[in-house]
UniProtKB/Swiss-Prot annotation:
The gene is nusB. This is Transcription antitermination protein NusB. The keyword Transcription regulation applies. Belongs to the NusB family. GO terms for biological process: DNA-templated transcription termination; transcription antitermination.
Length: 143
């Protein structure tokens, strides 16, 4: 398993923990993970970068997921699947340095590992709609 996959999995665990424990804020949660998860600095830094990006852009990320999830409210989605999609959607919408196919494939593989049997297809079905829409929603940078 590659360094970035491990970082994404660690980021998923952080986001899931934040969703599951409203009494702990993001800074405290990141500090807890630093103390309790013995990982390399490179792995931890990319994971924290992903988590901070998701938290910073969460309203836009959740809106993009919600707009593409027919008959599913965010509150009904399994937390693991939702946080996998949040990570990938952050990459798709805000990280031009990561190819869209890579983000989606990584999300599907993480869903296979952490989700249930339906998670990979569910995650893929929603994320597959985001790249073309996210690209259309980006401002024209040449102006």
């Amino acid at each position: 398993m590659g360094l970035r996959r491990e970082s994404r999995e660690l980021a998923l665990q952080m986001l899931y923990a934040l969703d599951s424990n409203a009494s702990v804020g993001p800074r405290e949660m990141l500090q807890m993970f630093r103390e309790e998860q013995p990982v390399s600095d490179r792995l931890r830094l990319f994971a924290e970068e992903l988590v901070q990006g998701v938290l910073e852009h969460r309203p836009a990320i959740d809106a993009a997921i919600k707009a593409r999830s027919k008959n599913w409210s965010l509150s009904r989605m399994p937390k693991v699947d939702l946080n996998i999609m949040r990570l990938a959607t952050y990459e798709l919408m805000f990280r031009g340095d990561i190819p869209k196919k890579v983000s989606i494939n990584e999300a599907i593989e993480i869903a296979r590992r952490f989700g249930d049997k339906d998670s990979p297809a569910f995650v893929n079905g929603i994320l597959d709609e985001i790249p073309s829409c996210a690209k259309a929603e980006e401002p024209d940078r040449e102006q």
